[in-house]
Amino acid sequence: MSSENKEQHDLSPRDLPEEAFGFPSELPLETQRRSGTDLRQSETGHGRRAFRRIHMELREKPDTDIKQFVIRELQKSCQCSAAKVRDGAFDFFPVLRWLPKYDLKKNILGDVMSGLIVGILLVPQSIAYSLLAGQEPIYGLYTSFFASIIYFLFGTSRHISVGIFGILCLMIGEVVDRELHKACPDTDATSSSIAVFSSGCVVVNHTLDGLCDKSCYAIKIGSTVTFMAGVYQVAMGFFQVGFVSVYLSDALLSGFVTGASFTILTSQAKYLLGLSLPRSHGVGSVITTWIHIFRNIRNTNICDLITSLLCLLVLVPSKELNEHFKDKLKAPIPVELIVVVAATLASHFGKLNGNYNSSIAGHIPTGFMPPKAPDWSLIPNVAVDAIAISIIGFAITVSLSEMFAKKHGYTVKANQEMYAIGFCNIIPSFFHCITTSAALAKTLVKESTGCQTQLSAIVTALVLLLVLLVIAPLFYSLQKCVLGVITIVNLRGALLKFRDLPKMWRLSRMDTVIWFVTMLSSALLSTEIGLLVGVCFSMFCVILRTQKPKNSLLGLEEESETFESISTYKNLRSKSGIKVFRFIAPLYYINKECFKSALYKKALNPVLVKAAWKKAAKRKLKEEMVTFRGDPDEVSMQLSHDPLEVHTIVIDCSAIQFLDTAGIHTLKEVRRDYEAVGIQVLLAQCNPSVRDSLARGEYCKKEEETLLFYSLSEAVAFAEDSQNQKGVCVVNGLSLSGD
């Protein structure tokens, strides 16, 4: 560091030029300078300080008549023109804006490369995650295929990859298992031996035409949940209630994903060991599942266990190498696909299913099944479950969209993103698909391999189409334990969040506690309950932060006329007889007592002063045996003429965002207590909302509006000016003589 830079770095606030400090009011710069000059102390002929009040004229409020507002909005909405229709179409289908302007030479190579890589990664992941959702492998491929095409049409992000997502598959799987258990409570037969009806199920020797087996009923449940989640997401976009996502903080989402990852890991452990276990339901399913696993550990399939260990030994180091050399590799090595191909060949030629009873994926049909509407009769059963799924889906999608848009210097429309992800669920639900959302891991791969636009999603869809039409049956011999390993290895990112905890603790202890509470409740209770607990606990933490907020007395840095905390900064001077108090939170029913006690403790407690005056008066009466007429309180005041060190309390309201009824009553009470002992209370830097609340709450009369000031300097100057008027302190027009 050069000596010049070091010298600037070591400057104290007093040494900095005056322009470096902002005037504490919300006035334009010229007004601030003029006001600062007017408010500086100057001596008149009588030795008194000149004081000039700042006046601001309120703008006229717009007409708030609800009827007229509705009529205006309806008229605006019903106006139709060619330009408005075109803009509406372009807004609803963003692809119409950017596709005609597509730069083929600049973008095509990166889009094709990223689309191919993501498509190759999606094939094994789609098959693996479909098992997590309790579905056949083909439905996972359908889901990723349709989601890629639909987001291409409706999405505004250039980089995110939308498709099948592990956390949502877990939540879908829990609903599917619950509904299957309701329909078939007394049987654990395979899908080929169960015919499921709305009223229950029966065991049959073979699949009959017109009957819905376990697999068929499972996708009915999954597609119905997906349809409802999409409806919720589109409705939230239509009513512009995306603000719901603000209650899902980064710490909460991270903790939820990590906790759900433990549930996913637990659900896949049985595949790694080759155990045939029913999925546990309800609260504490993770613990119950591990109890079942350890009780049946002696039944472990050695072939599946060895295959799982070999796959782990290949996938984990390969993932680490991909991460370590991602800057040097033009594209990540598709290790998952290599493992799937190798494992399929080994299983097929080694006849692992026949010789060692290893569980395999089984028949995967080619082509597309005829579209079919969701089962409307299931909507009452799954409507509540779809709420949590829809919120998680759109929150992750919108946050990833905004993150990558900010990184690459463009904008996304959060409302349109909700439409996009909603239609990615509604439309595919008629084509035997499950819920989708954006996924961080695939989005990072997509970005790092040169993606420029969502044309890469079409390339990804073509790769999946090739698999659906030609390659899918070749995965017949693929062991389910391999798919379980792929699912678990892809949880690395979420499970490694534990490494970030020390840094998170240093940044915010409250966020760390939120992370832990959400993670533990999601893992040990259930994903839905964990999300609800996380949201409720986060809101409780917000309330807790405002219940005991920071507050301080302020001092003046004279050269800049800036007021700051005396406990934080050095070389600040307090004005004689004036206490400036700052409260950093909204003033409402939760923290009103905290505000009052902090002010009385740091400035002066008028209740104790008044009590001391009464006590002194009574003692003096006893000593001198003097008889007074009148009220005892008046007697106390008349006998106590010792001047107080404080004559004015200035409350800095700049950090008070709003007041409620309790807050207004508290300010009135504080003002009444201080005026009872001859101290005036002034409010400074109130925002328009607070001023409006004070006016509606009748904090002061029309002639008492002089108690509200636009800046601290103005309030302090007024206090000094009123005190200097021949030693008389003026309180709301009442003079209290000091002799």
Curated annotation (Swiss-Prot):
Changing E417 to A/K: Loss of sulfate-chloride exchange activity. It is found in: Cell membrane; Apical cell membrane. It is a multi-pass membrane protein. Residues 1-47 are annotated as: Disordered. The chain crosses the membrane at residues 112-132, 137-157, 227-247, 255-275, 378-398, 420-440, 455-475, 524-544. GO terms for molecular function: secondary active sulfate transmembrane transporter activity; solute:inorganic anion antiporter activity; sulfate transmembrane transporter activity. The modification Phosphoserine is found at S12. Its main location: membrane. GO terms for biological process: chondrocyte differentiation; chondrocyte proliferation; sulfate transmembrane transport. InterPro entries: S04_transporter_CS, SLC26A/SulP_dom, SLC26A/SulP_fam, STAS_dom, STAS_dom_sf. Residues 1-17, 31-46 have a biased composition (Basic and acidic residues). It holds the Pfam family Sulfate_transp. It catalyses: oxalate(in) + sulfate(out) = oxalate(out) + sulfate(in); sulfate(out) + 2 chloride(in) = sulfate(in) + 2 chloride(out); oxalate(out) + 2 chloride(in) = oxalate(in) + 2 chloride(out); bromide(in) + chloride(out) = bromide(out) + chloride(in). Belongs to the SLC26A/SulP transporter (TC 2.A.53) family. This is Sulfate transporter. It comes from Mus musculus (Mouse). The gene is Slc26a2.
